Amino acid sequence: MGSDADDKIREIVELAKLYDIYGDMLSDHNRVVFEDYVLNNYSLGEIAGEVDISRQGVRDIVVRCSGKLRRYEEKLGFLKKINETEAALNEMEDMINAGNTDPEIILYCVRKARETLVK
């Protein structure tokens, strides 16, 4: 039971991150509808009344925008790079917090973080 809710939360977080990166590539109208549904948690009915379209029209826009954002990520991969860089930096932070301040290991982590940005 909790798994479906967890999956929905993960999907919303992913869409919010994709929107932060690629949202400006959506039309103004689509951006308003997507923001209201995904980021502001408005219902389809609330948005439909606000922008004067049907609830099905709102749903179609949200689905279409979600697909566009995912396709942008497939082609450009900015979120993947951000996540990989964050993981490399977290690894470096964990090593330092564990008392491992060997310059060679820290340099390795810095290079690893840099690689995630340039590949």
Regions from the PLM with identified roles:
Residues 33, 47-48, 58:
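Hydrophobic positions on the alpha-helical face of helix-turn-helix-like DNA-binding modules
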Residues 54-55:
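Helix-turn-helix DNA-binding motif, specifically the short coil turn and the N-cap/start of the second
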